[in-house]
């Protein structure tokens, strides 16, 4: 076990639960970027591929983290329900921003639940998702990772 992610007795359960939720968000993001790749305008295809690769990398790291925290990583679902139908390049961009908001929310929860290196890693992932969301949307939000909470639970 990597001592950098070893939880304290009081935070271990919360950190594991939040890491599992972040892992689930990364699984969903990978699926979503598959849909995005099929609809995105060619001018933004490279950006979508890079984001997809970053989500796969984070997913793999979270899989290891969940194990290090003593859990069994949850597998991805066979398919995910999208928040809206993706018919065009504009829809693909909107989905990408939505995905990044959701991922940022999951990492925000992990930042609150974890400590030490795991908290720093979660903060880095939150920041990266917020930057990607701002690039897709064309504008940032005041409190990345809290978007859906600020909108009263509305996520799309």
What does each model-identified segment do?
Residues 1-156:
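All-alpha RGS (Regulator of G-protein Signaling) helical domain and cognate RGS-like helical scaffolds
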């Amino acid at each position: 076990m990597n001592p950098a992610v070893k939880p304290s007795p009081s935070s271990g359960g919360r950190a594991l639960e939040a890491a599992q939720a972040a892992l689930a968000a990364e699984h969903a993001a990978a699926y979503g970027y598959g849909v995005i790749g099929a609809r995105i305008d060619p001018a933004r295809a490279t950006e979508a591929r890079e984001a997809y690769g970053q989500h796969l990398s984070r997913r793999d790291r979270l899989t290891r983290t969940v194990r290090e925290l003593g859990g069994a990583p949850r597998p991805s679902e066979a398919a995910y329900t999208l928040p809206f139908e993706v018919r065009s390049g504009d829809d693909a961009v909107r989905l990408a921003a939505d995905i990044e908001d959701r991922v940022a929310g999951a990492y925000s929860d992990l930042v609150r639940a974890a400590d030490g290196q795991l908290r720093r890693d979660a903060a880095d992932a939150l920041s990266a998702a917020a930057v990607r969301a701002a690039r897709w949307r064309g504008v940032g939000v005041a409190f990345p990772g809290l978007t859906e909470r600020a909108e009263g639970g509305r996520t799309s």
